[in-house]
From Swiss-Prot:
Signal peptide (from-to): none
Species, as recorded: Pichia angusta
Annotated region (Disordered), positions in chain: 101-171, 183-210, 291-316
Residue stretches of biased makeup (Low complexity): 110-171, 183-204
Pfam families: WSC
Name assigned to this protein: Uncharacterized protein in LEU2 3'region
Superkingdom: Eukaryota
Length: 373
């Protein structure tokens, strides 16, 4: 259980931060990890997982080590990373150094734990002093708190030391309490690791345990933590470039929508204009035909109202050479009817002649509507 707790906390707190640009003389103990064509700080730090130092040189060479330089940065890092030109990956004789503080603190805490494991009191004191700096000390303090024993009601904290006896149920409860506190601690670390901060990492765990004579136990856990997660230059640049690309894509989509809307409106207006133009043309055509018909009728009436010249005949005399036939049909009582044909001939320049009529008398055999024998 202690190993699992230490592993989870170590994974949450492990993160490389940029330390500075150092010359090759100011840093030692480095081992070349790889030379990557698309090198970046994030790729190199992934390759150096488990080491305290990750260093980049010549734009594409990655080195790992465990010796953190203590001097001030004195190098000149002007070479851009081959995989991410927005950040620098060392120079011709300088390293861009990134440090994993959790790995450095793990080494310090393990040495402190081995030097103070002789007695229970010393272990408890060591766990109190190292709780704010490492996860290994948190597991050791949980172990020391589980060994506290008492037969009377008490109130203890992580920083206190007690050696009075208690029952085995309290020990199990203390172990459970420590695992709960470590779980809450890892959750807090996960949530805080998404933000960038410049404050130093620190965490404090306070466990208050109250035990009654009837082995009834009440535990209150207070966890306060502030973890610094410095975002590397590559991660910040990647986030900004992704945000700008997202904004550009959003702008293009809005422009496309606006273009579609404007095009639709213009197309509708064009169709409406063509329709109105066609209707206007049809109306003009109809008006022209009506005007032409009126002109023709007027000319015909004008020509018919004029007297034709004397002595003219034929087509040149207008309607004077026309012949009108009128057929009248009727029915009278007592006979089948009669047909009268009237012919009138217009002589040029004169009134019509007297009509020549031909009367057809019905056959008397059909008088009364019955045939006569």
């Amino acid at each position: 259980m202690r190993f699992g707790v230490v592993f989870v906390i170590t994974q949450v707190l492990a993160d490389f931060t940029y330390l500075g640009c150092y010359s090759s003389d100011a840093i030692s103990g480095l081992t070349k990890k790889d030379s990557y064509t698309w090198q970046s700080s994030s790729h190199c730090t992934e390759q150096c997982s488990g080491h305290a130092v990750a260093a980049l040189i010549n734009g594409q060479d990655c080195y790992c080590g465990d010796d953190v330089p203590s001097d001030n940065p004195d190098g000149s890092c002007t070479t851009s990373c081959t995989g991410y030109p927005m950040e620098k990956c060392g120079g011709s004789d300088s390293y861009s150094v990134y440090v994993d503080e959790s790995e450095e603190n793990d080494d310090d805490s393990s040495s402190a734990q081995s030097s103070h494991s002789s007695t229970d009191d010393a272990t408890s004191t060591s766990s109190t002093s190292t709780t704010s700096s490492s996860s290994s000390s948190l597991s050791s303090s949980s172990t020391s708190s589980s060994s506290k024993q008492s037969s009377s009601p008490q109130s203890s904290t992580m920083s206190s030391t007690d050696s009075s006896p208690t029952s085995s149920s309290l020990s199990a409860s203390s172990t459970t309490t420590s695992s709960i506190s470590s779980f809450s601690f890892s959750q807090s670390s996960s949530s805080s690791s998404t933000t960038s901060s410049s404050t130093p990492s620190s965490e404090s765990v306070r466990i208050t345990t109250s035990v009654s004579p009837g082995n009834m136990q009440t535990s209150i856990i207070y966890i306060t933590q502030s973890v610094a997660t410095a975002t590397s230059a590559s991660a910040a640049a990647s986030s900004s470039s992704a945000s700008s690309a997202n904004n550009r894509s959003t702008g293009l989509s809005k422009g496309a929508k606006a273009g579609i809307a404007v095009g639709s409106i213009l197309g509708a207006l064009l169709l409406l204009g063509l329709l109105l133009l066609f209707l206007f043309w049809r109306r003009r055509q109809r008006d022209d035909r009506d005007n032409l018909s009126e002109k023709r009728a007027s000319s015909i009436l004008a020509s018919s109202s004029r007297q034709p010249p004397a002595g003219s005949r034929g087509a040149a005399a207008g309607i004077g050479a026309n012949r009108i036939r009128i057929h009248v049909r009727g029915r009278q009582t007592g006979h089948a009817g009669h047909v009268e044909t009237v012919q009138r001939r217009f002589v040029a320049g004169t009134l019509p002649l007297e009509p020549r009529c031909r009367r057809i008398v019905p056959d008397r055999r059909f008088a009364g509507g019955k045939p006569r024998s």
